[in-house]
Amino acid sequence: MIVPCIDLMDGKVVQLVQGRKKALEGDTPLEMLRKFGEFPEIQVIDLDAAMGHGENSALVEMLTVKARCRVGGGVRTADRARRLVDLGAHRVIVGTAAFTPALEEISKAVGAERVLVALDSKDGKIVVKGWREATDLTAVDVLHKLEPYCSGFLCTYVDKEGMLQGTDLEWFRQLREATNHEITAAGGITTMEDIRALTAMGIHSALGMAIYTGRLDLAELARLNVYYPPSVS
């Protein structure tokens, strides 16, 4: 499955490099939704909420009402997760809170089937708090322990995020061998060859910069989702 990304900051659709530097702005959120309507699921990340600088709840609500979305950004409590589901999110993405007791509370509040755990890796270690703080853990270390609380994992290879330089297929292969849960890959996915290799492993692809810069063709990507219903009905 191909999952296009809509990242929100200050009410706009943006793409960041390494989660820090803004590289470009996209069309309006509604226009991006129209462009992505043929895809089975859209990934919406509220960057302001993730960084603790406010939130874009009105935009998130508008997007989730109109399309099947997985939503992340600042999901640190059960109340926040419930609120996103109430707004219309199909699934919520939990990052930093996955390494606290809050994960179990979130899972109980909305159901494990509605939770995706974000595992972001830089220099081989999981990073949290907007990729600003490194841990001593690797993604493979924690996959099994987190499985009871989620339906899948969003795994980002931060080293190449937003850089259009390709991703680390071997890292994703190791993750695939470590869990039977759904995995969505992100970070540096740039070519159809990357996507085909991930698909062959049984891994979904979340795409941002490669779509927004035109490196990958939306129509060609949509055809890869022939077995999935569109997110916008």
Q: Where are these predicted regions, by residue range?
A:
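Short catalytic helix/loop segments, enriched in acidic residues and glycine
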Residues: 19-36
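Glycine-rich, proline-tolerant flexible connector loops at the mouths of alpha/beta enzymes
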Residues: 41-55, 96, 155-164
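Charged helix-capping and loop-helix junction motifs
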Residues: 25, 54-61, 132-141, 165-174
